[in-house]
């Protein structure tokens, strides 16, 4: 057994129980406090895993915000929440940090039920400005709300929702602070000089003079530096020769500011708080992974990490027992793309997370990363399909929710053959309820023209990719869970499946279990438990929720006293469609006992996937108990045909 990593010495942080304690610290002490918070973040995440790089990048900004503003009366809204660990440490949750992302522990994101310092929960991007503006207008209408501050990253601000909020905030012209945390752009020396000059001026003059001050500084510089400063300012503002983009939207723009310069941050935030009347955007440039060399040198690899050695940065990864679903998808799609030049892939800022980075390395001109823009991703894919391409739109289940109108209106209504790759289906573990893939089956299966599949294992996933490649009759979707497969034998190449055709994987006579998706192995385990009690069980894999294999369902009903459907999704999904079919086809007329097993009607909090499914009542033991109870109430109808359920 290894000894735990020694915790860092943090004399200043030890004195801070809540942000109010920071008011007594000098600016120099606040700078040292930031160093201690950074050490604490590294120590914590080394033990728990989590989002490291983003949190390290905002340490100074977090300290400065809590030192200047009066949270929780002032509402500090973090976008996404990946970067919230320093915030949690400073707001009374330090002693709980080593429970981060664990069962019964702290969330990895901001969460209203966790702390008064988390006024708005986050885990999906680009929501912060809208929420902060809502708080600001609540204040204007008499609610006990102080200042409102939204902290949003340069990735999140690419999403349309952020610009909708900026546009509305500019129109309302109420006091609101937006901090643009830009961690993808370094500051060259001329830009640093410009930023410092603007910081000094902002502490002495109204913000309205900042543009004139910037122009004056540029004019005073030698030729090459003057041109460089002008280009740099235009680069970060995007509106050469006129107002900045943010100013055109009605904001006062300040920046860029070095987000690791505590003095500059404190001066800027204090001046903003003292003088602002309308909305102001402060552009802060930070470095992802700041202060920890492994994370600075590989920000993509240290965005989200497993437990790691804080000295070397080496992450602790368990040995895989079976292929990873996402990698199976990425590799298989790449092989199919080598055979079919019409195949393209689309991702919304998640090339590695969705596996399309594998194809991107081989066919870079056929993989499109559209940024955090799921709505655009879906309709862009629809356009590609309309042009004759075979687009695979790869988006996590929980993020696909953001593009639902586009799926319905731009894809399904026009019957365009977009292939939806739905990763992270079902419960996902440490990221908890915000990232659970619970609702996609329900909201997609209800759409006309849609074909919907769910992979029972990694081999089935390969077959479904091949099916999607061959399917040009309309939109088609397939879903699969996070993590490892179940260790089945893998085919060399996928077989095209017949749409709406399931398979029987085990034959029995008493009760039938019809599984949709990756809970098939739990259904098979349940069958073994029942078999040991003398109950004969048929287990079938539906493969499709739309179209349903009604022939298979009919045969299961005719030959069994009870039928149990099992799925890794919410109510209103596969089982609901089976029940609807049976109700309209007379399947219940003879006394069939049907039980529909889904995720419960609540959000399931973070834990290991095994614990989450136990909480949901979807273990093999739960399936067996449900089947046992159904069998006790069902009765066998006279057979209307003699054929047994077909096996594949």
UniProtKB/Swiss-Prot annotation:
Keywords per UniProt: Isoprene biosynthesis, Magnesium, Metal-binding, Thiamine biosynthesis, Thiamine pyrophosphate, Transferase
Residues binding Mg(2+), per UniProt: 154, 183
Known cofactor(s): Mg(2+); thiamine diphosphate
Residue ranges that the Swiss-Prot or TrEMBL entry lists as coiled coil: none
Residues passing through the membrane, by range: none
Pfam family for this entry, one: Transket_pyr
The EC number(s) this enzyme carries: 2.2.1.7
Metal-binding recorded as keyword: yes
Cofactor note: Binds 1 Mg(2+) ion per subunit. Binds 1 thiamine pyrophosphate per subunit.
Protein name from the UniProt record: 1-deoxy-D-xylulose-5-phosphate synthase 1
Encoding gene per record: dxs1
